[in-house]
């Protein structure tokens, strides 16, 4: 059993299975609340404000940054993305577990802004297996694959910064390990 204050951060390289693990974890544990990110990008068709994202204009977003209103935030492709602090703290204050599935840089920011959170790094069984998974997706160009793999090498070097490392070799075993880690 892990002692933490309700905030769970899951990160790891692209292709490691974070998204799949998080989806299964949420399905089996409806008491866990997945944090909704804020963004300045334009909503895509069918996206709902407050459900898919909190859609903000750049001024609103920067105002929140200035007021330390995000646990973490970043700019990507000309838009801002961030995890609103208030909604996470509100859920935690009423005893809910809050889950963030974020990138390495965001996890590092959260460690500074909310150090009592529990951070889990999802790792592949090997770099070769990670490459195989990324290539098997069939969605990326060779250039994009190489970019993901180079980024993954950097991210894997950071795994010891985390409270726990879960190797996603077999999905069900990795999921069970995560559930044991966050059980309170």
Swiss-Prot record:
Lineage of source species: Bacteria, Bacillati, Cyanobacteriota, Cyanophyceae, Synechococcales
Organism: Prochlorococcus marinus (strain SARG / CCMP1375 / SS120)
Guanylate kinase-like domain mapped to chain residues: 5-183
SUPFAM superfamilies assigned: P-loop containing nucleoside triphosphate hydrolases
EC number: 2.7.4.8
Gene symbol of the encoding locus: gmk
Protein name: Guanylate kinase
Purpose of the protein: Essential for recycling GMP and indirectly, cGMP.
Record's catalysed reaction(s): GMP + ATP = GDP + ADP
GO cellular component assignments: cytosol
Coiled-coil ranges (or none): none
Keyword Transmembrane: no
Keywords: ATP-binding, Cytoplasm, Kinase, Nucleotide-binding, Transferase
Pfam families in the record: Guanylate_kin (PF00625)
Any one Gene Ontology molecular-function term assigned to this protein's record: guanylate kinase activity
Positions annotated to bind ATP: 12-19
Keyword DNA damage: no
Localization (cell): Cytoplasm
EC class name: transferase
Protein family (similarity comment): Belongs to the guanylate kinase family.
